[in-house]
Design a protein with these regions (language model features):
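Phosphate/NTP-binding elements of NTP-utilizing enzymes
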Residues: 2-166, 170
Length: 171
């Protein structure tokens, strides 16, 4: 692949508005991934493990259940303890939604901007490790947001920042 097709010289990212010739197998994979979030995650999602470094995401059954639940319901509440892979699962869900739902807006909100950016960084790492035929072209890619050529947008912000920037009522 020519460097002309890379987003800002990053060989792992596809630039927006370039023509890609898909094989029949790639088309079938895109369709299958768009319909089955668990298959997409198990087959193409990469995560960082403290012990093993970059590795395929192998979700546990409860994580698969969360994926299906979020996919099928507008509102989901998960009562879970710390360190159970909630963030990893949600990053996978966010990436699936952004890729396969045009004009989808995703806000990653946390109590601190650095935490929200760290979660966005996990999503960016996973995105960079997708095969090109699954990637949407990149319109914007930075520490605080991503815009894909299908119109999907992902941004990271602190909740405290939102409080300070919201308009205050005046008499």
């Amino acid at each position: 692949m020519s460097t002309v097709n890379h987003y800002l010289g990053n060989p792992k990212l596809k630039k927006a508005n370039i023509q890609i010739d898909f094989s029949q197998e790639e088309i079938q994979e895109v369709v299958r991934c768009s319909k089955d979030i668990v298959y997409f995650c198990e087959t193409y999602q990469k995560i960082i493990s403290i012990d093993e470094g970059l590795m395929p995401f192998a979700p546990y059954d409860y994580q698969k259940e969360i994926m299906h639940s979020v996919n099928e319901n507008r509102f989901v509440i998960c009562k879970m303890p710390r360190q159970t892979g909630k963030t990893t699962t949600m990053v996978a869900i966010m990436m699936h939604y952004a890729l396969f739902n045009p004009d989808f807006n995703i806000a990653i909100l946390a109590n601190k901007a650095a935490t929200a950016r760290e979660i966005l960084g996990r999503l960016q790492l996973a995105y960079e490790n997708l095969p090109w035929f699954l990637q949407q072209g990149i319109v914007e890619w930075n520490k605080g947001s991503i815009i894909l050529e299908n119109g999907s947008k992902i941004f990271a912000s602190s909740t405290s920042c939102l409080l300070y920037t919201s308009p205050s009522p005046r008499d």
